[in-house]
Amino acid sequence: MKTKILALALATGLFFNSCSSSDDPTPAPTPATGEITGPITANKSYAYGNYTLKGIVKINSGVTVTFDAGSTITIDKATGDNALVVLNGGKLIINGTADKPVVFTEKSKVPGSWGGIIMYGDAPAKVAGGGTSSTSEDGNNISYGGSNATHNGGSLNYVRVEYAGSKLADGTKENNAFTFYSVGSGTTLDHLVAYKGADDGFEFFGGTVSMTNAISYGNYDDAFDWQDGWQGTANTNWYAYQTGKGNYGMEIEASANDNSFGPKVTNITLKREAGNVPEVGDNQVDAFQFKREGNGEYSNIIVDGYGNFTTGATTYQGAVVSILDAATNTHQVNTSKIKILNVKISNTTNVTPIAGATGFTVAFPAGTFTTSTTATGASLAAGAWASVDGASLIK
């Protein structure tokens, strides 16, 4: 009997021991640390961790750089000019998730403290004067443009860039949170956040890449901006919240080239906080501003907060759509190359398209500007990727 009792006790102990071991939580991985400098001339993978980026870090052609989910990369403007630059032929793979985004931030938390993420490719561009290539305006002075529509610069998934938009080199070259020069359709841009930069949230210079699930929050210039014949057509779920200071929800231009390959964006929300003033020297606060032959098709839109207001001696004029020059009106509006479809408008003074200058009248052809009471705008899931310091960016 004693032998049986002992055997039973041993078995019971082993059972509970086994349960206890299997139920123990898996310890969190220890974050790696390190410094990121350039140029990066060989493939490099950065494990989950906390890193410091110093200088203009260029990823050379033929090189792939990867960041794991949950990593934080900190920049210090006191070290000088800083940016992460993907040269044509290089690839940047960022594998963030909704709960563990990869965050690029700056120590002082001051807008305009670094140059953000800049990517170059050789997809088609149509630059001023009708040419197919130009030199970047970011201070790097790098040529962009080409014929490789499917250029692949990597994949950016669940990435947040904070406090970018700095002027580089000569003090006149402004950058954005995300800047794409002739980036091609082989590149993935998904679940990206541009937070409190001193210039645009996102800017495209030509190229064929599309972007999905994007948030532009509190950027000083435009939430979304492009030129040089950007041709992305698979864009969806774009959300902008303009607070503190900001120009337009979207600034749309084609470098004065009359073309027929306008971009397409579906599911758009453009919101502007009351009293949010534009940069010095401008008095327009438009949701959509078209100029220099800009065009495209935009659908299922919410526009809120683009109303006229006065601060001090300055009166600001808001509109859902503003056409800034006669050429754009003649070549793009009148030929139905601009379509604003199913837009729900609130707290906005000019609810029909207006002329942003004198000497012409804007009248969209039938069916090219339509309003709706049921438009839903961008559909984005909340989470760590869309939050800063615990506060959601989706208002």
Task: List each model region and its residues.
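Extracellular beta-rich repeat passengers
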Residues: 27-28, 36-43, 47, 53-60, ...
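Hydrophobic or amphipathic alpha-helical targeting/insertion segments
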Residues: 91-103
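Catalytic metal-binding/acid-base residues of hydrolase active sites
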Residues: 72
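Bacterial Sec-dependent N-terminal signal peptides
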Residues: 2-38
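Short alpha-helical basic/polar micro-motif
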Residues: 222
